[in-house]
Amino acid sequence: RRLHGQAINRPGSCPRVMIYCPARHPPNKCTSDYDCPKPQKCCPGYCGKQCYQPE
């Protein structure tokens, strides 16, 4: 969802990622929070962006 050209993010913060996959451009499973079921957020993950429960 966008409001006046800006993406609206869901509350909370993304979990911290400690290790990343070796792929140069891993595929993303989401592009914004609104690609994820509520209340999840679209966050950088181990290998590309994924939906996670916010912290």
Curated annotation (Swiss-Prot):
Residues 7-55 form the WAP domain. One of its GO terms (cellular component) is extracellular region. Keywords: Calcium, Glycoprotein. Glycosylated. The keyword Glycoprotein applies. Signal peptide: none annotated. Pfam families: WAP. PROSITE patterns: WAP. Disulfide bonds: none annotated. InterPro entries: Elafin-like_sf, WAP_dom. One of its GO terms (molecular function) is peptidase inhibitor activity. Inhibits calcium transport into spermatozoa. This is Caltrin-like protein 2. It comes from Cavia porcellus.
